[in-house]
């Protein structure tokens, strides 16, 4: 390192001499000045010859002339390292002006003939170097003492009240000033301040006592470490370390034999939490994951519960209540008036344009309101026929006695519209708290994440993080490989769905409790104004809910079924049934199920085995209502063209709406009905007569069984179950009931029961009756499936013959059962004769080329 050369002088601080023992200084008593400089100044002088900007911010060196003193101002005890880093990119001019004003505020008034010649702001260190020029009549010590007095007075005024003193105790922002004793190095490197400074020497090092005397004035010192070539001082605050570095670095001691250079040293702190985690992974990671899960529950579950309540009460209802707020009215009413004025102006302009151009916008208005009108037509037509049933549904809800209602009806019969639109939404009290669950959205979910997302959407469960499911499984797998045990973080989809419904139960309970608390508060307010003998008795929660059924939310579970479309989602329906039964048993909600699958009632029976369900059965609309509905929708007055079209459609809302859409698209009524019948026929042949597999265990019918039912229903509207089980392809067994239930599920047939026992079989959709006739009237299709049907009958008789012959062989060995032999011989003859007849019919069908002929077989089927 280059040796020091004396280039200029500065006065020694007498206070420093008093703090140090005399033997530490090799200075003569006659010597009034100490001299210090470095080769850096030579380098600066050489580099400044051709430069125009030689300021300290550019060169890092502060020049000082005679009668000038350099002080360091510290403004705050800041530990905000982010702020320190960002300060490097802030505009220095703006910050410098602010700092200069602050220096003047705390330092003024200056002694006479004194002034500030330069302010160098250090934003990273929350301080500044300030160079003063003082009067020759003053000494540097006297001038510095005046400055310190002004700053002390400013700090006293700043913290004069108790509030500011409390802030200052926590966050010291008082201004402090120190004399710069060394040669400061002005740098803006990414060396951020720390409590620890490193001291290197040029020359003889200092002892621990000398370092303490030198640095103690800047703040409390926690520790001092002295080494051969370097020493370290650990201050109690970062502010003290900053002041010490800027004031002492470059200082010469011992007659120029020792020069001090100071830099910040990052303090390496031990993080005991991280050390514990890294040392005890098997214990720490499960604890951390458990804490994170608990934290997530505490944060997100109240939010999700609020969103579920919002879903039940509906946003429109909440907005209506919010509009009653007086502050909202102050803002909303002027806005509404302005909006109406603007809208009226546009209407006037549009009217004038229409008068000039001759264009009328009446048709456009009609088109805009078309959807609303169609809903009104639907309500007017079908409401009359279902009015009494809607009254019954409302009555059951208002009775508030185990409100567990089942609305049954074929697919497309308008069960959802009947319950939600015509019954609940039409009542001002009941519509306030309604939650509609679409079960088919859940049963059709193909993946675990889509199932969770669909369930959350139906319940209003928000926020939901489906991606965490995959991450938790990945973490669980990693922890199992790392620690040898599972974290338990990942959950099955059954558990996750169950937790979502459990939270929905809490939200529903909160709604009922909220209404009860409002009631209780109102009664208590009234009782404060009444005498003791006039006070109103506060009802218990159960009594309140019994008298106020509208306080309990109405849960509508739509399209409830026996099995899900996706086999892995079959747990959904039993889970929903158990959840609904819990709501009823806890008396916190009304539950209404809508279903077209009678087999789904088994889930409800399992969930509430001792409960008697209230049932409402919906059927198709009458022909007259269907005809009027179509005429109103199509704006037709001449109904003669519709007479032949309505009969195949019956009163099924789904088919009526499809027919109306076809007519509006430009099809002729007869053409439209023919296309619908052909599509239905294609659906039947594709899915029922070709052994189409809906799922692994759902296609339990034989195409010949479907063909037989089609032929019977094409001739008459109803089949007696007792007559059906006498036919060869059917028998009184569980298999027959399962087959018919499956066909009912897919809407091919409709089953009627009397006192819970199957009695009648009808066509599932009225349109299917015409489709049956369409299929049977096609000679090619009739020959195909009729032959297949007869071959199945032949197979049945062959099986019987084999059975009889085997039994005869066994009996002949005994040789003592002549009566049984005669019986079996007659049965063999009958089966043999049937086979002959069936084969003859098969030959006749193969040779037949005309229309399907009416045959009267000995079975009495045709």
From Swiss-Prot:
Membrane-protein topology: Single-pass membrane protein
Matching InterPro entries: Mt_escape_2_C, Nucleotide-bd_a/b_plait_sf, RBD_domain_sf, Yme2_C, Yme2_RRM
Transit peptide: 1-36
Coiled-coil positions: 820-847
GO BP term (any one): mitochondrial genome maintenance
Topological domains annotated Mitochondrial matrix: 37-282
Subcellular location, record wording: Mitochondrion inner membrane
Single GO molecular function: RNA binding
SUPFAM superfamilies named in the record: RNA-binding domain, RBD
Cellular-component GO terms for this entry: mitochondrial inner membrane
Function according to Swiss-Prot or TrEMBL: Plays a role in maintaining the mitochondrial genome and in controlling the mtDNA escape. Involved in the regulation of mtDNA nucleotide structure and number. May have a dispensable role in early maturation of pre-rRNA.
Protein name: Mitochondrial escape protein 2
Organism for this UniProt entry: Lodderomyces elongisporus (strain ATCC 11503 / CBS 2605 / JCM 1781 / NBRC 1676 / NRRL YB-4239) (Yeast)
Designated gene of the protein: YME2
């Amino acid at each position: 390192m280059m040796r020091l050369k004396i280039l200029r002088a500065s006065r020694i601080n007498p206070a420093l001499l008093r703090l140090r023992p005399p033997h530490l200084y090799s200075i003569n008593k006659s010597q009034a000045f100490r001299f210090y400089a470095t080769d850096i100044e030579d380098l600066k002088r050489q580099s400044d010859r051709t430069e125009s900007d030689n300021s300290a911010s550019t060169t890092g060196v502060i020049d000082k002339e005679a009668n000038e003193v350099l002080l360091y101002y510290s403004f705050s005890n800041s530990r905000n390292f982010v702020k320190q880093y960002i300060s490097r990119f802030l505009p220095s001019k703006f910050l410098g002006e602010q700092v200069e004003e602050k220096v003047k505020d705390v330092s003024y008034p200056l002694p006479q003939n004194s002034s500030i010649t330069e302010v160098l702001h250090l934003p990273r260190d929350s301080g500044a170097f300030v160079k003063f020029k003082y009067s020759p009549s003053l000494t540097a010590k006297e001038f510095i003492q005046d400055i310190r007095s002004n700053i002390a007075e400013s700090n006293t005024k700043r913290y004069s009240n108790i509030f500011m003193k409390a802030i200052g105790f926590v966050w010291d922002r008082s201004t402090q000033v120190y004399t710069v004793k060394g040669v400061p190095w002005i740098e803006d490197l990414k060396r951020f301040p720390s409590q620890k400074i490193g001291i290197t020497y040029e020359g003889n090092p200092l002892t621990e006592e000398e370092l303490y005397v030198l640095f103690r004035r800047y703040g409390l010192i926690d520790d001092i470490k002295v080494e051969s070539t370097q020493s370290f001082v650990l201050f109690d605050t970062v502010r003290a370390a900053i002041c010490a570095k800027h004031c002492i670095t470059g200082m010469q001691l011992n007659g120029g034999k020792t020069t001090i250079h100071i830099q910040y040293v990052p303090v390496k702190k031990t993080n005991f939490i991280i050390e514990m985690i890294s040392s005890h992974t098997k214990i720490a990671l499960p604890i951390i994951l458990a804490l994170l899960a608990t934290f997530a529950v505490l944060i997100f579950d109240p939010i999700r519960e609020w969103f579920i309540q919002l879903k039940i009460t509906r946003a429109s209802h909440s907005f209506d209540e919010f509009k009653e707020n007086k502050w909202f009215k102050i803002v909303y009413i002027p806005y509404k008036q302005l909006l109406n004025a603007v809208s009226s102006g546009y209407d006037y302009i549009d009217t004038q344009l229409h008068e000039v151009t001759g264009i009328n916008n009446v048709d456009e208005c009609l088109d805009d309101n078309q959807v609303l009108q169609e809903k009104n037509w639907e309500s007017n037509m079908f409401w009359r026929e279902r009015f009494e049933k809607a009254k019954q549904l409302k009555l059951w809800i208002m009775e508030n006695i185990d409100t567990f209602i089942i609305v049954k009806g074929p697919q497309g019969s308008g069960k959802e519209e009947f319950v939600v639109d015509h019954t609940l939404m039409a009542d001002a009290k009941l519509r306030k708290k309604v939650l509609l669950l679409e079960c088919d959205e859940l049963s059709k979910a193909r993946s675990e994440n889509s199932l969770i997302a669909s369930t959350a959407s139906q319940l209003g469960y928000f926020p939901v993080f489906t991606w965490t499911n995959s991450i938790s499984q990945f973490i669980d797998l990693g922890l199992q490989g790392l620690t040898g045990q599972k974290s338990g973080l990942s959950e099955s989809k059954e558990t996750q769905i169950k937790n979502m419904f459990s939270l929905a139960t809490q939200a529903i309970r909160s709604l009922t409790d909220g209404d009860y608390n409002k009631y209780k508060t109102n009664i208590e307010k009234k009782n404060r104004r009444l005498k003791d003998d006039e006070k109103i008795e506060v009802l218990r929660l159960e009594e309140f809910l019994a008298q106020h059924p509208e306080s309990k939310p109405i849960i509508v579970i739509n399209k409830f079924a026996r099995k899900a479309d996706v086999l892995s989602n079959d747990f959904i329906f039993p889970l929903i049934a158990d959840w609904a039964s819990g709501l009823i048993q806890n008396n916190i909600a009304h539950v209404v199920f809508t279903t077209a699958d009678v087999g789904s009632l088994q889930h409800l029976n399992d969930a509430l085995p001792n409960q008697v369900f209230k049932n409402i059965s919906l059927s198709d609309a009458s022909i007259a209502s269907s005809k009027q509905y179509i005429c109103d929708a199509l704006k037709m007055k001449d109904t003669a063209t519709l007479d032949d079209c309505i009969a195949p459609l019956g009163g099924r809302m789904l088919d009526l709406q499809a027919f109306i859409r076809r007519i509006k698209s430009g099809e002729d009524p007869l053409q439209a009905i023919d296309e619908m019948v052909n599509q239905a026929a294609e659906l039947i042949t594709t899915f029922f007569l070709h052994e189409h597999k809906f799922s692994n265990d759902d296609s339990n019918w034989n195409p010949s069984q479907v063909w037989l039912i089609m032929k019977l229903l094409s001739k008459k509207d109803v089949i007696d179950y007792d007559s059906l089980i006498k036919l060869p392809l059917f028998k009184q067994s569980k298999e027959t009931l399962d087959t018919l239930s499956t066909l009912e599920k897919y809407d091919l047939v409709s089953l009627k029961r009397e006192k819970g026992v199957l009695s009648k079989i009808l066509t599932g959709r009225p349109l299917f009756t015409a489709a049956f006739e369409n299929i049977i009237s096609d000679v090619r299709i009739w020959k195909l499936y009729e032959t297949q049907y007869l071959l199945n009958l032949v197979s049945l008789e062959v099986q019987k013959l084999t059975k009889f012959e085997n039994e005869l062989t066994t009996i002949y060995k005994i040789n003592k059962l002549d009566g049984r032999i005669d019986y079996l011989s007659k049965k063999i003859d009958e089966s043999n004769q049937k086979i002959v007849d069936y084969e003859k019919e098969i030959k006749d069908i193969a040779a037949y080329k005309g229309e399907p002929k009416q045959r009267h077989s000995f079975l009495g089927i045709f």
